[in-house]
Amino acid sequence: MLASYLNLFNTPWNSSISIIMILSNIMAIVVGRYSIKVRGLKPPIAISQLKDFGVPELLATMSLGHIIGVGSTIGLKTLNFITY
């Protein structure tokens, strides 16, 4: 109810939001790469730079990155740092 009042979920997609989402996902992958203790389980990813980093780890870090990105977008929109 508060979100509809503040009109937070009607923000059109623009380049600033995409940059926030990309940076949030990259940050989550980097943090997950060094903080996940049990990694490298099946199935692997076919990228040589991400050795011992499988599909479960990628899905977990990308999910965290999306949560961080959406929270950042809503917070920055509330503080009027993101404009149309």
UniProtKB/Swiss-Prot annotation:
Which compartments does it reside in?
Plastid, Chloroplast thylakoid membrane
Q: What top-level branch of life does the organism fall under? A: Eukaryota
Where are the bilayer-spanning segments? 12-32, 54-74
The alphabetical list of record keywords is: Chloroplast, Membrane, Photosynthesis, Photosystem I, Plastid, Thylakoid, Transmembrane, Transmembrane helix
Q: GO BP, one example?
A: photosynthesis
- What coarse category fits the chief subcellular location reported for this protein? plastid
Q: How is this protein situated with respect to the membrane?
A: Multi-pass membrane protein
Q: Which GO terms describe its cellular component?
A: chloroplast thylakoid membrane; photosystem I
Q: Does the keyword Ion transport apply?
A: no
Q: Which family does it belong to?
A: Belongs to the PsaG/PsaK family.
> Under which name does UniProt file this protein?
Photosystem I reaction center subunit PsaK
Q: Taxonomically, what lineage is the organism?
A: Eukaryota, Rhodophyta, Bangiophyceae, Cyanidiales, Cyanidiaceae
- The coding gene here is psaK
